[in-house]
């Protein structure tokens, strides 16, 4: 399948540059792939019209690290880093600006005199070794929220709150699991009032989620691994919900990939503990969804693995028709944009 089949044209005015006025106030497009119907809601809070006590919701509670860092090269120029994965107390994978000019052995001066050296480098990332242990509070103090490059404005303090979900707990993501940004405390209270169960897994968002597909053919894309955690107690609740016939609603593509990666459909059991996945789901792969029944997600960038996953879940033609309708109706796209609820998969 050709990657360009997942391209679409989007007016720049529909790329959300700021979050909605308050969580839950974004618009919601609802897709029913089986009936080929599209519904429109003026608020994400109206998700309650489509779920009930027979639904079990799963969220990704990874927390976004302030992973955008700035340092000075030995030549005195400013260099930008995006810290990806922690692989040791002083060792991280990262992206680096002007990558072609940066070579193994280069040393950079970070805030407070911390020094970082490129240990190794490949086509997509570097391994960065610091001269001292780096705790998370260092990034909290000196780093910046890694808002995506299509948000073309100056850094704003509002991002420190709104680019993070209200339930984020475990630091490790280099980008937000943006589907969760829509959920407010009031909405969680409504879930509880309506006896709608929910729980959390943890997948740290990295290159596997946000690296675009650059190969001409979808099948040739190299999907990067991302680490995730499913606790025993969470797995037990999920398995029991499925046994009772409840519909599992995944909040976001990251949650879906974690659940689908670790569920054994024959044993009807999850593998628990810390794991990693490079699961790449796209139309034409004939992937059979094992555990997730419903998907809540955002409107994604062209030619992204996220758009491909949603297309496999709901049907490519139907998804692209819904995107076209969304554009015509002025829906906002990408991280701070409006939301989509897919009621079932094909």
UniProtKB/Swiss-Prot annotation:
Q: Name one Pfam family in it.
A: Queuosine_synth
What is the top-level taxon of the source organism? Bacteria
- InterPro entries, per the entry: QueA (IPR003699), QueA_dom1 (IPR042118), QueA_dom2 (IPR042119), QueA_sf (IPR036100)
**A cellular-component GO term for this protein:** cytoplasm
Single Gene Ontology MF annotation: S-adenosylmethionine:tRNA ribosyltransferase-isomerase activity
Tell where it localizes.
Cytoplasm
Q: Name one GO biological process term.
A: tRNA wobble guanine modification
Which HAMAP family does the record match to this protein?
Answer: QueA (MF_00113)
Q: Name it.
A: S-adenosylmethionine:tRNA ribosyltransferase-isomerase
């Amino acid at each position: 399948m050709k990657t360009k089949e997942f391209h679409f044209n989007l007016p720049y005015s529909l790329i959300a540059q700021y979050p909605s006025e308050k969580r839950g106030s974004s618009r919601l497009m609802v897709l029913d792939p089986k009936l080929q119907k599209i519904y429109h809601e003026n608020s994400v809070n109206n998700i309650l019209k489509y779920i009930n006590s027979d639904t079990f919701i799963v969220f990704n509670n990874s927390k976004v690290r302030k992973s955008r860092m700035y340092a000075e090269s030995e030549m005195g120029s400013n260099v930008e880093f995006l810290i990806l994965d922690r692989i040791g107390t002083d060792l991280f994978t990262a992206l680096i600006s002007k990558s072609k000019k940066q070579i193994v052995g280069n040393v950079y001066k970070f805030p407070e005199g911390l020094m970082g050296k490129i240990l190794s480098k490949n086509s997509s990332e570097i391994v960065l070794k610091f001269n001292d242990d780096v705790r998370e509070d260092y990034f909290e103090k000196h780093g910046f929220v890694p808002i995506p490059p299509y948000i073309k404005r100056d850094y704003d303090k509002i991002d420190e709150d709104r680019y993070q979900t209200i339930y984020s707990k475990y630091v490790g993501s280099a980008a937000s699991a943006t589907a969760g940004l829509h959920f407010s405390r009031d909405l969680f209270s409504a879930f509880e009032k309506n006896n709608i169960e929910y729980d959390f897994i943890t997948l740290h968002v990295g290159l596997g989620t946000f690296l675009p597909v650059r190969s001409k053919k979808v099948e040739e894309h190299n999907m990067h691994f991302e680490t995730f955690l499913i606790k025993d107690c969470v797995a037990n609740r999920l398995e029991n919900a499925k046994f009772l016939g409840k519909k599992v609603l995944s909040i976001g593509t990251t949650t879906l990939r974690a659940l689908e990666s670790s569920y054994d459909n024959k044993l009807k059991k999850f593998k628990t503990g810390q794991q990693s996945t490079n699961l790449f789901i796209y139309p034409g792969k004939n992937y059979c969804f094992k555990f997730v029944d419903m998907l809540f997600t955002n409107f994604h960038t062209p030619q992204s693995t996220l758009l491909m996953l949603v297309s496999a879940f709901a049907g490519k033609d139907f998804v692209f028709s819904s995107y076209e309708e969304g554009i015509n109706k002025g829906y906002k796209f990408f991280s701070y944009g409006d939301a989509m609820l897919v009621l079932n998969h094909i």
